[in-house]
A protein has these predicted regions:
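An acidic, charge-biased composition feature
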Residues: 1-286
């Protein structure tokens, strides 16, 4: 399978409707943004004829086709999984892309429904939310930590989360992930190598280091539910960016979701007072 991507050089508003039309003919397609350079909008996972797609998009001087790089994922199955998860999220949220129309309460409601459906034993749908919030919190200065925590606490007290019906069929990616695990083509840290992560030693916190060093023997390492949550969240962060949701709100979403399973405020307050990092679950799920 030879995938290509399309990078847009000009006004994305002109192409918005045409891009959405491609979802009907490109089963792996998803919308993304460059991570460096000009951060241009792009669509990836394209398999169709370039001339045919160009005719659909129109205004052919506003975009270019390039070959999809193959140096990030360990195998083609990982890339297809990546495409499928992004594609599912695009179909839910693309009406809000390149605009400022989405409500944060709706996104949090969606995340809560996803987390509840992914969780089957303990905290599979929530663990990565706490991990990402804690990684962010740990990078802040002492003053920033206190400031952000107080802002999040106040915002949390006032937020009214929307009841958002689950709009994604998670059975399909779960089945795919299970098959890939059984074939040794996927684990929790894919597409990265656990050995290389340990060797590099770039840990976000002591909790993160402890988790990484003991990962190979852990429950989450080859858990299809933990893996789906991690991959889905990484795709969701692209979706948030495309909806013009500020980065700080991304971490607030993590905070809100983590509060469902962990005493986040207590963990943060203890860290601020003692410098001790400790993660524990709420009693009702232990």
């Amino acid at each position: 399978m030879n995938f290509t991507q399309i990078i847009f050089n000009s006004d994305i508003d002109y192409y918005k409707t045409k891009i959405f039309e491609l979802f009907d003919i490109e089963k792996y397609m998803f919308i993304d943004r460059e991570y460096d350079g000009e951060h241009r909008i792009r669509i990836r996972g394209i398999l169709g004829d370039e001339n045919y797609i160009s005719d659909i998009l129109g205004k052919k001087n506003g975009f270019v086709f390039i070959t999809e790089p193959d140096d990030f994922f360990e195998n083609i199955e990982q890339f297809i999984l990546y495409c499928n998860i992004h594609n599912m999220l695009d179909k839910v949220w693309c009406k809000h892309y390149f605009a400022n129309t989405v409500k944060l309460e709706d996104v949090i409601g969606f995340c809560k429904e996803m987390a509840e459906n992914i969780t089957v034993k303990s905290d599979e749908g929530y663990n990565s939310h706490f991990s990402h919030f804690w990684g962010f919190f740990h990078t802040l200065t002492p003053y920033q930590k206190i400031r952000i925590l107080r802002i999040f606490q106040k915002k949390y007290q006032n937020i009214k989360i929307t009841e958002y019906p689950l709009a994604i069929d998670i059975k399909t990616p779960l089945n795919t992930i299970e098959k890939m695990i059984n074939m040794d083509k996927l684990n929790f840290f894919s597409p990265q190598s656990l050995d290389k992560i340990i060797e590099n030693g770039n840990f976000a916190s002591k909790i993160h280091e402890h988790t990484i060093r003991n990962a190979a023997e852990s429950e989450f390492y080859k858990s299809k539910h933990y893996i789906l949550n991690r991959w889905y969240l990484n795709a969701l962060y692209v979706t948030l960016m495309l909806m013009n949701i500020p980065v700080i709100d991304k971490y607030f979403i993590n905070y809100v979701m983590a509060m469902e399973k962990y005493p986040v405020d207590e963990i943060c307050e203890m860290y601020l007072k003692t410098g001790e990092e400790k993660l524990w679950k709420r009693e009702n799920i232990v």
